[in-house]
């Protein structure tokens, strides 16, 4: 079982007096490979509500208890209540949720002009957040004595939450890393999914130009008590080694990487994904990434078991800034099939066809999409040599 450094019990809660928050040491959530649960996590027959409705791992318990306390302390921009949710009729299975307050009260996005934009310490970044916004530090124990320690990751509340338990995974904020995916950050995101007993705990990444609103390296993590299309969508292999697949039956086709769990296979996946995102960043191509438990590649069905972790990568048109007139903005969760809608009118009138049109508007032109696919296939082939 994952344990804190120096005791059998640790508290991820803030002390009663807010004057003590800044003086309190950030608690560590320490875990090892034995705590990563790759198999046996499935959706119950009746979809659960908030994470409390399912068995909790130590990670779930730490995150949910600390997050709930921050709600009670008023550290969010609004108090998230149970969101009105509907499954849009149609073949895709979009999960639409009405979240008016996020649309109105979220922090305005920074001015971004390039996928490769440098970190700017003058702009808002995660070194400027209030002490109470940090829940804990993810600390991975080395698998073997003498192996390199992995970087620590801060788990921070998203003050404008999409859903219950919405957090940001921030690698060592003092390093002032720009919003460019790195292997350590991706590893922490995948392992967070494997630390949770909830099949609906997902992690994602938005690049600059892919609707990242802060240019300081971070991933999103949150609970959603609904299946999503990307979990079991069928795929076709793109490379002879079977490392890269195409999810074709989605409004925006995505590149699928898959692992059965921790070990060398996971490390190889992290390397392949980051080589792909490095290529996209270096070529000024915006992208979004989504991590979820899911079925293996190939032909699947709605009853396919969640036997591993799917990492889906979308290359897309750059979009700098928020489009206020749309029902939703297309980023990591929308591409995966989760649609946080900004107004009651749009929520009541939204159709699958309208959602598909908004998402497809973000797709690269066909010729550029073909070039990107060929380049990523070539990258995977180089790894085999």
From Swiss-Prot:
**Major subcellular site:** cytoplasm
Give one GO biological process term: glucose metabolic process
Key word Isomerase present in the record? no
Catalytic reactions on record:
GDP-alpha-D-glucose + phosphate = alpha-D-glucose 1-phosphate + GDP + H(+)
Q: What is its EC number?
A: 2.7.7.78
Which residues constitute the catalytic centre? 218
Q: Where in the cell is it found?
A: Cytoplasm
Q: Which UniProt keywords apply?
A: Cytoplasm, Guanine-nucleotide releasing factor, Hydrolase, Nucleotide-binding, Nucleotidyltransferase, Transferase
Q: Which GO terms describe its molecular function?
A: GDP-D-glucose phosphorylase activity; guanyl-nucleotide exchange factor activity; hydrolase activity; nucleotide binding
Q: GO terms for CC?
A: cytoplasm
Please name the InterPro entries in this protein's record.
Answer: GDPGP (IPR026506)
Q: Which family does it belong to?
A: Belongs to the GDPGP1 family.
Miscellaneous: The orthologs in A.thaliana are GDP-L-galactose phosphorylases catalyzing the first reaction of the Smirnoff-Wheeler pathway, the major route to ascorbate biosynthesis in plants.
Give the protein's recorded name: GDP-D-glucose phosphorylase 1
